């Protein structure tokens, strides 16, 4: 949250030079506050587990957030009870006339599926096009990043030969960027993907600013300069056991997966893994809610014209 200080305090300009968000008394006096409306397009099979992961991170902010869950796949789910979907999820037709402060598009286990073979690919394109006029800021996670880069920038699907699975080190490129505010210079985050995100590709074919990348030169966190779209290629929302569950699932399926990198103590799957990315995940989502949503969204959502003073 911003700090509130008198307009004339010398610290105002000093802190702003470091890109610290300072709210002057004159601006604060005219600021109205309401709950933020955040839409979550949940593409993961185990929807309840995914809900828990994202809501845990969103709840770590002092901001009040109203959550709406969205589904676009009408097929019967094998992993989530129909009663749960009917009670807690809406269809796109239910909300297409509404506006939202934020939208989160989750990952999906579709890394080896061509875009046009995804059953709900037309609906994904519809939601992304709709979000341009109805959402202040959208956050794409893992597979959704790949889908958005294709739809919004025409970047072809980039696929790794082997699945990237484990907990990897990253470093920030812009220490004073709002989305990385408070990040350590280097930090850990989990990945579980076939999608490939070379930083050079993002720089060459988009106007997006890369804010953090892996030690191997893959883009991890990047965003548009107007803060309307942000991308995270890993899974900072994952629980401590999620990578283990995926690993043992693949073992049982006879896929002979590699042991997730830097995850199990002593690289032994019989050891209980520890989460080393919780603080990063919480800070990332808090920064997104504050700087990319709350600070630029209009008070009256009927008039969508996000700006940042």
Swiss-Prot record:
<keyword id="KW-0963">Cytoplasm</keyword>
<feature type="active site" description="Proton acceptor">
    <location>
        <position position="235"/>
    </location>
</feature>
<dbReference type="Pfam" id="PF04204">
    <property type="entry name" value="HTS"/>
</dbReference>
<feature type="binding site">
    <location>
        <position position="192"/>
    </location>
    <ligand>
        <name>substrate</name>
    </ligand>
</feature>
<dbReference type="GO" id="GO:0019281">
    <property type="term" value="P:L-methionine biosynthetic process from homoserine via O-succinyl-L-homoserine and cystathionine"/>
</dbReference>
<dbReference type="InterPro" id="IPR029062">
    <property type="entry name" value="Class_I_gatase-like"/>
</dbReference>
<feature type="binding site">
    <location>
        <position position="249"/>
    </location>
    <ligand>
        <name>substrate</name>
    </ligand>
</feature>
<keyword id="KW-0486">Methionine biosynthesis</keyword>
<feature type="active site" description="Acyl-thioester intermediate">
    <location>
        <position position="142"/>
    </location>
</feature>
<comment type="function">
    <text>Transfers a succinyl group from succinyl-CoA to L-homoserine, forming succinyl-L-homoserine.</text>
</comment>
<dbReference type="InterPro" id="IPR033752">
    <property type="entry name" value="MetA_family"/>
</dbReference>
<feature type="site" description="Important for acyl-CoA specificity">
    <location>
        <position position="111"/>
    </location>
</feature>
<keyword id="KW-0012">Acyltransferase</keyword>
<dbReference type="GO" id="GO:0004414">
    <property type="term" value="F:homoserine O-acetyltransferase activity"/>
</dbReference>
<dbReference type="GO" id="GO:0008899">
    <property type="term" value="F:homoserine O-succinyltransferase activity"/>
</dbReference>
<feature type="site" description="Important for substrate specificity">
    <location>
        <position position="192"/>
    </location>
</feature>
<protein>
    <recommendedName>
        <fullName>Homoserine O-succinyltransferase</fullName>
        <ecNumber>2.3.1.46</ecNumber>
    </recommendedName>
</protein>
<keyword id="KW-0808">Transferase</keyword>
<comment type="similarity">
    <text>Belongs to the MetA family.</text>
</comment>
<feature type="binding site">
    <location>
        <position position="163"/>
    </location>
    <ligand>
        <name>substrate</name>
    </ligand>
</feature>
<comment type="subunit">
    <text>Homodimer.</text>
</comment>
<comment type="pathway">
    <text>Amino-acid biosynthesis; L-methionine biosynthesis via de novo pathway; O-succinyl-L-homoserine from L-homoserine: step 1/1.</text>
</comment>
<feature type="active site">
    <location>
        <position position="237"/>
    </location>
</feature>
<dbReference type="GO" id="GO:0005737">
    <property type="term" value="C:cytoplasm"/>
</dbReference>
<keyword id="KW-0028">Amino-acid biosynthesis</keyword>
<dbReference type="InterPro" id="IPR005697">
    <property type="entry name" value="HST_MetA"/>
</dbReference>
